A protein has these predicted regions:
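A short helix-to-beta-strand connector/capping loop
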Residues: 82-90, 128-133, 180
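Flexible, Lys/Arg-rich cytosolic regulatory linkers and terminal tails that connect or flank
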Residues: 1-5, 131, 138, 149-150
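Residues in the short beta-alpha loop(s) of Rossmann-like NAD(P)-binding domains
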Residues: 52
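Ferredoxin-type iron-sulfur electron-transfer modules and their immediate structural context
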Residues: 1-24, 58-77, 111-128
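N-terminal Rossmann-like dinucleotide/flavin-binding domain of flavoprotein oxidoreductases
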Residues: 58-106
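Short glycine/proline-centered loop/turn elements that form peptide/ligand docking sites
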Residues: 55
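Rossmann-like dinucleotide/flavin-binding elements
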Residues: 17-49, 91-105, 113-122, 137-186
Length: 186
């Protein structure tokens, strides 16, 4: 997501494309925004297509967790950077199709469409997600935003988190201080 040239400062901005170049970036999360800004800064004409009505992707979504509110800062920085680039065109509420991408006559297409939660092949897990007994991180944040997790909701409940990576730890960081008994399976 973050430009690898950062340790070198803005040295990559001194590099310019030698001929006209059209870049289509599909996805307006932080990776897509970074790719779009970097390509525009070196002289490419960039067309960023985002299906939602806002930019920032998962970083903006995850920032709804109380301990992650500062994650909104990076997408805001990227949006400000993008707004200064007159050769970067952003299309919100635009689902990319092959035909649409072809209309921009791209020399390069960047797939920055993000990710979906991995649902491990545990028997019955998918059915329990559908019934609402099991939640993905997306479900959890949507429920949090909908007010379904008041502070006393967790007290005394057992929460099992499958996956001990950063997202799993974010979930534990939310539930444990609110009195839930938490178990991580990794």
């Amino acid at each position: 997501t973050v430009n690898p040239a950062v340790p070198e400062g803005d040295i990559y901005k001194n590099m310019k494309v030698k001929k006209s170049c059209n870049v289509v970036v599909v996805g307006g999360g932080t990776a897509g925004l970074e790719a779009a800004c970097t390509a525009a800064e070196v002289g490419c004409n960039v067309f960023l297509l985002e299906k939602k009505n806002h930019l920032g992707g998962l970083s903006t979504f995850i920032s709804d967790l109380p301990s992650k509110t500062r994650m909104k800062d990076f997408p805001k920085y990227l949006e400000a950077r993008a707004s200064r680039l007159h050769n970067l065109y952003i299309f919100l509420n635009t689902e990319a199709t092959v035909e649409m991408v072809k209309r921009f006559k791209p020399d390069i297409v960047v797939n920055a469409t993000g990710s979906v939660p991995l649902v491990p092949p545990i028997p019955g897990l998918k059915e329990n997600i559908a019934e609402g007994n099991v939640a993905t991180i997306f479900d959890m944040i949507n429920n949090l935003n909908a007010g379904k997790y008041p502070d006393d909701f967790c007290k005394g409940k057992e929460v099992v988190v499958v996956g001990g990576g950063s997202v799993g730890l974010d979930v534990i960081e939310y539930f444990a201080p609110r009195g839930a008994k938490c178990t991580i399976i990794d």
